[in-house]
A protein has these predicted regions:
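Extracytoplasmic beta-strand/coil segments of soluble accessory domains associated
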Residues: 53-62, 66-70, 86, 90-130
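N-terminal periplasmic accessory domains that precede
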Residues: 85-88, 107-112, 122-127, 142-145, ...
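Short acidic/polar hinge/loop motifs at secondary-structure boundaries
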Residues: 130-159
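Periplasmic-side early beta-strands and strand-to-turn transitions of outer-membrane beta-barrels
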Residues: 164, 176, 185, 192, ...
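Face-selective signature of the C-terminal outer-membrane beta-barrel domain
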Residues: 257-272, 288-410, 419-421, 476-480, ...
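Outer-membrane beta-barrel signature, preferentially recognizing the C-terminal barrel domain
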Residues: 282-299, 327, 375-377, 421, ...
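Gram-negative outer-membrane beta-barrel transporters
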Residues: 389-395, 478, 482-486, 504-580
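C-terminal beta-signal and adjacent terminal beta-strands/loops
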Residues: 528, 600-659
Length: 659
């Protein structure tokens, strides 16, 4: 009965968000707006003028971007809250939370694509710069759990290929974390806790003075310990046995950004600790990552801009018990990007990249310990993208990236599209793009007793067709997208041999479906959002390659009063996962993940000086208090692993000062 009411609520919010287009809301011209009012005005005006930078590497309207995209605004971040980046991304249309048995315990899948045991089909960017993990090929749990979300200005998500401009891993999606810019001086601190042992804290300092901009912040979280029973078949007798386990979920992160007259430096640190379930044995996995980028922009001519970037990232993982692994890998990337504007109708983007990756893995399950990976590889790429406006309402886009990865042959991936605005506020997009994911160091060179790399592997490939129709005005934003992806040369593990061997799958895989999204401001205070994803996937032999529900629906409702009281609720419905059933642990089931965020800004009531303030907030996740078990992706047994403990409640305080 309760599930039916929640499903009905989703439908009502979705229909409201996609059906009502009213008159423009009058804008407040006061220069003395507080932060909340400023955000209201920005987003009411910005729904029809949302600028994005990820699709083309320069600022353009969302309707002009040659990609299918979703944007999480600063206003949405403030209204709905979220302790981690994963919490926020699970609200994005077309994204679904996922998990695996070992290194990547926290992942998101874009439009159902989760064929790997890590997030290697998604490229994460920080202000446009890539953050890759090159040993396994895509671990991102530390970023999703520990990046300081309090510093985010917005998140741009490309749903579909992005390799023409971003290279390897920009396969089924790209997530660009865009941080805030300093204006004057801002100091902000928050702390929260709960009765079950949960705790979180964050701080941020933003300073702009004399052309120098400094943005600094940090975040910490500790989830309640989860005492549960995990059952497995992995033992000599092949009989089910139980393990009492206390599962951890902790993380910390920091970020620093310095900007001075075209010269930029940014760096981040993220660390996370969680559980692993390799061969059915419960253990701990700890990961940490350092990231740094030095960039410089200059104007070579009146219509020619250049950007130079040197990017470094290092990822370290430890599993001190079984599977007794220590990993250490890094990537150095040098990129030169050019933007040439020939006229109002013609624009060219081109650039080149050179990167070097290396990594080691030590297996200490035997004595003496074994060095099972010690690899390195060079890579390079050249990309070009051209856009031409045939008319004011019709634009053509085309591009290609040629790349050379290690000893592999030269290869290329293209993109092309047609963007048409047939009437005011309406836009149509017909896009095709290809992408690739290069084999990781482990996939080509691992010499573990249980798993061996294959030096003959070739990159995974995908080609995606997108057909999108959208409507935007200053109160509403609605889009419907049909997608069809054909993936080839997917890399899997052949577990029929001992040791297991990586290989390229011969049969292609197909993902297709409908992805729809709507956002609507009823008034300045009321905001609704909703989305529906339906996808199916298969290859020649398997009907459900990916452990992601075919049907998912999301809905959020938020009220932000002028007196500083915000109340928001969000429901994430995940349907039944076809083809996956657990034989001994709880089975994966359809569920509603309900969250709420309530904030009381007491500044107006208690402080006359608007430059200082404090607020109380209450945030709750998984309010139905239902434990979530998901398929044990990457294991040979039909089993599940524990992912979400149940209800988590935080009560916290924020204080800030602006100058």
């Amino acid at each position: 009965m309760g599930g039916n009411r929640l499903s009905t609520g989703i439908a009502v919010v979705w229909l409201t968000a996609t059906a009502g287009f009213g008159q423009p809301v009058p804008q407040d011209g006061s220069k003395q707006e507080d932060e909340a009012s400023r955000l209201f005005s920005m987003d009411l005006d910005g729904l029809s003028n949302t600028n994005v930078t990820t699709a083309s590497k320069f600022a353009e309207k969302l309707s002009d971007a040659p990609s299918v995209m979703s944007v999480v605004s600063r206003d949405e971040l403030r209204r709905f809250g979220g302790t981690t980046l994963l919490d926020i991304l699970e609200r994005v249309a077309g994204l679904t939370g996922s998990s695996a048995f070992f290194a990547d315990r926290s992942m998101v899948a874009v439009r159902g694509d989760q064929t790997r045991t890590d997030a290697g089909h998604i490229l994460i960017l920080i202000n446009g710069r890539p953050v890759r993990e090159v040993l396994e090929g895509g671990v991102s749990s530390d970023i999703l759990k520990s990046f300081p979300v309090n510093l985010l200005e917005r998140i741009e998500v490309i749903k579909g290929p992005g390799s023409v401009l971003y290279g390897s891993d920009a396969y089924s999606g790209v997530i660009n974390l865009i941080t805030r810019k300093a204006e004057g001086k801002t100091f902000h601190f928050s702390a929260a806790g709960g009765g079950a042992g949960e705790a979180a804290g964050a701080e941020e300092i933003l300073i702009e003075r004399g052309g120098l901009s400094v943005v600094e912040g940090g975040q910490y979280h500790r989830m309640p310990r989860w005492d549960t029973i995990f059952q497995s078949f992995h033992n000599p007798s092949n009989l089910a046995y139980s393990q009492a386990a206390t599962l951890r979920d902790d993380g910390e992160g920091a970020y620093l950004d310095l900007n001075y007259k075209g010269l930029t430096f940014m760096s981040s640190y993220t660390a996370a600790e969680g559980a692993s379930f390799v061969r059915g044995i419960v253990g701990d996995v700890r990961s940490k990552r350092g990231f740094g980028d030095l960039g410089y922009s200059l104007k070579a001519a009146s219509q020619w801009e250049m950007r130079f970037n040197l990017t470094y990232s290092r990822f370290v993982l430890d599993a001190p018990l079984y599977p007794n692994a220590h990993r250490d890998a890094n990537e150095v990337d040098l990129e030169w990007t050019n933007f040439v504007t020939f006229s109002e109708r013609d624009r060219l983007t081109f650039g080149t990249t050179i990167n070097h990756i290396q990594g080691q893995e030590i297996y200490s399950g035997v004595q003496p310990a074994l060095l099972v990976e010690d690899g390195k590889r060079w890579g390079s790429g050249f990309y070009v993208q051209y856009e031409h406006r045939l008319t004011d309402d019709l634009k053509l886009i085309g591009g290609v990236q040629a790349n050379k990865i290690g000893s592999l042959a030269f290869d290329a991936v293209p993109r092309g599209g047609l963007l048409w605005n047939p009437a005011a506020h309406f836009s149509l997009k017909a896009l095709y793009g290809a992408a690739f994911r290069a084999p990781s160091l482990d996939e080509t060179g691992l010499t573990h007793p249980g798993l061996t790399g294959n030096p003959k592997l070739v990159p995974e490939k995908v080609g995606t067709l997108d057909l999108q129709a959208s409507y935007q005005n200053n109160r509403a934003q609605v889009s419907v997208d049909y997608f069809h992806s054909r993936e080839t040369q997917l890399i899997f593990e052949d577990g029929s041999t001992r040791p297991a061997l990586y290989y390229n799958l011969g049969a292609p895989a197909t993902f297709q479906g409908i992805d729809s999204e709507g956002k609507y401001y009823l008034r300045r205070n009321w905001f609704l959002m909703g989305s529906v994803l339906y996808q199916v996937n298969h290859d020649k032999a398997i009907a459900n390659l990916s452990p992601i529900p075919s049907l998912g629906a999301k809905a959020g409702l938020s009220y932000a009063a002028e007196n500083g009281v915000d109340v928001s609720v969000f429901d994430d419905y995940r349907g039944h996962i076809g083809g996956y059933a657990a034989s001994i642990n709880p089975r994966p089931e359809a569920l509603h993940s309900l969250s709420a965020h309530v904030r009381f800004d007491l500044t107006k009531r208690w402080l006359k000086n608007g430059d200082r303030g404090f607020a109380f907030f209450l945030h709750g996740d998984d309010l139905t208090n239902r434990a979530v078990w998901l398929p044990a992706l990457g294991t040979n047994s039909p089993n599940t692993i524990p992912v979400v403990r149940g209800r988590t409640l935080y009560f916290g305080l924020e204080v800030w000062q602006k100058q």
